A protein has these predicted regions:
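Extracellular/periplasmic periplasmic-binding protein-like sensory domains
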Residues: 239-310, 371, 377-380
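Immediate post-signal peptide segment of exported/extracytoplasmic ligand-binding proteins
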Residues: 23-38, 69-74, 97, 164-169
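Beta-alpha junction/loop-to-helix N-cap segments that form part of ligand/metal-binding clefts
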Residues: 21-22, 49-53, 68-142, 206, ...
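Periplasmic-binding protein-like
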Residues: 96-108, 128-130, 170-175, 222-232, ...
Length: 380
């Protein structure tokens, strides 16, 4: 078990003296406190991303306090290390629930987030899971848990939509041997077939994909659109091999390739390649001012986890305001019907199964050796 003294950090969004004005000042003095929990991996391989998540929540808390707090009370954060394993996720969530927090945001590693969600839901505490993949959380059917990431099916829909937009006629879907890649490739293939297009599907070994075999599949199919659902580095080598073989059609990769490894492996062949990926601050012009505020405070650029946690904490605060109460059941009731609340990607709405009604997938494109925004896909 994690040492409680090291793992349990209580972080104030702002010191009370800083969040309240002197008598006669312009801002109302905050009276009392409201504490939200933040769960993130703060040790191990994912610690850097975990700290990014925490920093995003801290910025949201500070800005909420600058704006008068929540229900006139100062926002504070209770931060727990949830690690990346089910046991540590459950332990961190249990400690947060014991603090009677008004709600929990965070969750990054899928296995830890699912375990944490079960622990939090047992207490009825609202939990906005900001970074972990949504599918297993939705399948669990936990009434107080709301994922803020899209599902694999939603990524498949984004991919097929972009194929249609680019007037694809002959599609080849290529996967590696991993379960996630296989699932996404299957969903995309089924949707492409349903749209009446010609589609071929082939899988390769996850660790040592036969690039020559994959290139042969594309050539034999006379494909004009290739979609890769596997890991980043092999995906980069694949697009390079395709271009060397004379393939001139579209190449798109899944969110697994949203990585410098893809760009490095592909080299110049990455240029103009597309990507289905969850939106992050570097792709969203609407996040530029926020990113500048983040950098001014933390002396570094924010990542996706910071942006997601920032939006999650603001959404939780909005639910508390609408409920005019911190009672868990009332906050949970308000999360699916936030009034006029927007994130950096648009309106935040949850479907009946707690999936995002409007998911956060976008289309990125490699331009000048870097990922740029090609389309938000959304019209709201």
């Amino acid at each position: 078990m994690l040492a409680l003294g090291a793992a349990a950090l209580v972080v104030s969004g702002l010191l009370a003296a800083c969040s309240a004005s002197d008598e006669g000042g312009g801002a109302a003095r905050l009276r009392g406190e409201i504490t939200f929990g933040v769960l993130a991996p703060l040790s191990g391989d994912m610690a850097e991303r975990g700290q990014d998540l925490v920093d995003g929540a801290q910025l949201a808390a500070a800005e909420l306090n600058d704006q008068g707090g929540v229900l006139g009370r100062q926002v504070k954060l209770a931060v727990e290390d949830g690690g990346c394993a089910p046991a540590t996720g459950e332990q961190g969530a249990t400690r947060l629930a014991a603090k009677s927090v008004a709600g929990v945001v965070g969750g990054l590693c899928e296995n830890a987030a699912v375990a944490a969600a079960n622990a939090v839901a047992a207490e009825g505490t609202p939990f906005l899971v900001s970074s972990a993949r949504a599918d297993r959380l939705i399948e669990a059917g936990l009434p107080s848990v709301f994922p803020m990431e899209g599902t694999v099916y939603q990524e498949a829909l984004a991919a097929v939509h972009w194929m249609g937009y680019r007037s694809a006629q002959r599609v080849v879907v290529l996967a590696d041997g991993s379960p996630a890649s296989q699932r996404l490739s299957g969903l995309v293939t089924d949707r492409v077939k349903a749209d009446g297009l010609t589609v071929s599907r082939q899988s390769a070994e996850a660790n040592r994909p036969d690039l020559a075999g994959l290139v042969s599949t594309v050539t034999a199919a006379k494909a004009d659109f290739v979609y890769w659902t596997g890991a980043a580095e092999p995906g980069g080598r694949l697009v390079s091999a395709l271009r060397q073989a004379g393939y001139t059609g579209y190449f798109m990769a899944s969110s697994e390739s949203d990585s410098p490894e893809f760009l490095q492996a592909a080299g110049a062949a990455a240029e103009d390649a597309f990507l289905t990926t969850a939106a992050g601050p570097r792709l969203l012009p609407a996040a530029a001012d926020w990113a500048a505020r983040f950098k001014d405070r933390f002396r570094r650029d924010p990542g996706r986890d910071a942006m997601q946690a920032y939006d999650a904490l603001r959404a939780m605060a909005q639910a508390v305001r609408q409920a005019a109460d911190t009672a868990p059941s009332k906050v949970v009731d308000n999360l699916p019907r936030l009034e006029g609340f927007t994130t950096f990607t648009g309106t935040l709405r949850f479907a009946a199964d707690h999936s995002l009604r409007y998911d956060n997938y976008v289309i990125a494109q490699v331009r000048g050796g870097t990922f740029t925004l090609a389309s938000k896909l959304r019209t709201d």
